[in-house]
From Swiss-Prot:
Single Gene Ontology BP annotation: cotranslational protein targeting to membrane
InterPro entries documented for this protein: SecY/SEC61-alpha (IPR002208), SecY_CS (IPR030659), SecY_dom_sf (IPR023201), Translocon_Sec61/SecY_plug_dom (IPR019561)
Location(s) in or outside the cell: Endoplasmic reticulum membrane
Name of the molecule in the record: Protein transport protein Sec61 subunit alpha isoform 1
One Pfam assignment: SecY
Residues passing through the membrane, by range: 29-46, 81-97, 110-131, 149-167, 178-196, 242-259, 286-306, 357-379, 421-437, 444-458
Cited function: Component of SEC61 channel-forming translocon complex that mediates transport of signal peptide-containing precursor polypeptides across the endoplasmic reticulum (ER). Forms a ribosome receptor and a gated pore in the ER membrane, both functions required for cotranslational translocation of nascent polypeptides. May cooperate with auxiliary protein SEC62, SEC63 and HSPA5/BiP to enable post-translational transport of small presecretory proteins.
């Protein structure tokens, strides 16, 4: 069945737009340049409004997922990386359930990647139509078929640009991947904005600055009771406060600390005597992949729930999936799940909410830990990082594990890699929950993604530096 499926996909893969692999080794300076160009294009698309929309002032139904999915409401980046990640999620689940078996051959890998890109384009079209027809930009009957089609085309072209930008970096022209770059940029931008935003918000206590740092100085300057001013700056509700900022810094430090946890397996050369090395198996073996896929799962569930809720409000099954309420406290108007499955899969708003509704907290914790562990364990099977794949790579490099024969390497690696993947995914989920409960800026998932991505780029720089010799030689 797997071969038949990949063969069915093959004719479509030929006509898909594709970035050619570089014919020569790309120098680090060029990689930095291409990465900067990619980021510039993404940021420009984040600021270009969609042409033809009548209104985007209503409550934002996807406010809680925008930071993680690198999307910006009412712009060309409305969909963000959602189509790419969703297609990856679908293909992984199909491969994990053995509905599609991906072989070890380069041909099968290429067809699998092509199928993922094809699904990404189909999902882009589907999400574009759903966004337009559910009235996110105005009543479709008032806008007319022409404007609806125009908005759909804009969203599709923007989604295609994101797909190609991600492929450009992954083919070796830039550093890391487009998905990682866009997520990290969006989250870091959010953190900086929440800390230093000069925007004023009218609260019950009067006009206050949104940014936590600016609010601290403003409150100290305008309040006669300095102790109360400090208390407000640290604990004010519905706006970023200093405790949120401290929690964010704390989570950053904890994740970076855990990044250093690993098991070094001793290996030696099968060709040369006395040549020894180690193969590191990190605690976060699959890095941030589990949390990205978990976010894609939840975001698509939110989309389906809100679409059904808008059309069939009051239906029992729709209500069981999720009921939604609009809120505008402490920021822009947004929709928030207040009941049903979506409510229990969303993080509690604060530590106080955990105490008020412990069942919600327990369900959320179990879901986060379980889903992250599952996605992490299944990801290694389809990404070429399982014990069998690692043993094959070591064999190609003529390396063997010390104290083990070449034939027993897979068995020995199986003792470590699946465990590291599952336990690492579990830890990723636990850290995300901790960040949510502490009230970290940008959500626990967002902070975790930002730290792991920034650490990945740090490792890339260190690796390139060791190859070239110095940071100056890298850039100049």
């Amino acid at each position: 069945m797997a071969i038949k499926f990949l063969e069915v996909i093959k004719p479509f893969c030929v006509i898909l737009p594709e970035i050619q692999k570089p014919e020569r080794k790309i120098q680090f300076k060029e990689k930095v340049l291409w990465t900067a160009i990619t980021l510039f294009i993404f940021l420009v698309c984040c600021q270009i409004p969609l042409f033809g929309i009548m209104s985007s002032d209503s409550a934002d139904p996807f406010y809680w997922m925008r930071v993680i999915l690198a999307s910006n409401r009412g712009t060309l980046m409305e969909l963000g990386i959602s189509p790419i990640v969703t297609s990856g999620l679908i293909m992984q689940l199909l491969a994990g359930a053995k509905i599609i078996e991906v072989g070890d051959t380069p041909k099968d890998r290429a067809l699998f990647n092509g199928a993922q890109k094809l699904f990404g384009m189909i999902i882009t079209i589907g999400q574009s139509i759903v966004y337009v027809m559910t009235g996110m930009y105005g009543d479709p009957s008032e806008m007319g078929a022409g404007i609806c089609l125009l908005i759909t085309i804009q969203l599709f072209v923007a989604g295609l640009i994101v797909l190609l930008l991600d492929e450009l970096l992954q083919k070796g022209y830039g550093l890391g991947s487009g998905i990682s770059l866009f997520i990290a940029t969006n989250i870091c931008e959010t953190i900086v904005w929440k800390a230093f935003s000069p925007t004023t918000v009218n609260t019950g206590r009067g006009m206050e600055f949104e940014g936590a740092i600016i609010a601290l100085f403003h409150l100290l300057a305008t309040r006669t009771d300095k102790v109360r001013a400090l208390r407000e700056a640290f604990y004010r509700q519905n706006l970023p406060n200093l405790m949120n900022l401290i929690a964010t810094i704390f989570v950053f430090a904890v994740v970076i600390y855990f990044q250093g946890f690993r098991v070094d397996l001793p290996i030696k050369s099968a060709r040369y005597r006395g040549q020894y090395n180690t193969y590191p198996i990190k605690l976060f073996y699959t890095s941030n992949i589990p949390i990205i896929l978990q976010s894609a799962l939840v975001s698509n569930l939110y989309v389906i729930s809100q679409m059904l809720s808008a059309r069939f409000s009051g239906n029992l099954l729709v209500s069981l999936l999720g009921t939604w309420s609009d809120t505008s406290s402490g920021g822009p108007a947004r929709a928030y799940p207040v009941g049903g499955l979506c409510h229990y899969l969303s993080p509690p708003e604060s530590f106080g909410s955990v105490l008020e509704d412990p069942v919600h907290a327990v369900v959320y914790i179990v879901f986060m830990l379980g889903s992250c562990a599952f996605f992490s364990k299944t990801w290694i099977e389809v990404s070429g990082s399982s014990a069998k794949d690692v043993a094959k790579q070591l064999k190609e490099q003529q390396m063997v594990m010390r104290g083990h024969r070449e034939t027993s390497m897979v068995h020995e690696l199986n003792r470590y890699i699946p465990t590291a993947a599952a336990f690492g995914g579990l830890c990723i989920g636990a850290l995300s929950v901790l960040a949510d409960f502490l009230g970290a800026i940008g959500s626990g998932t967002g902070i975790l993604l930002a730290v792991t991505i920034i650490y990945q780029y740090f490792e890339i720089f260190v690796k390139e530096q060791s190859e070239v010799g110095s940071m100056g030689a890298l850039l100049f």
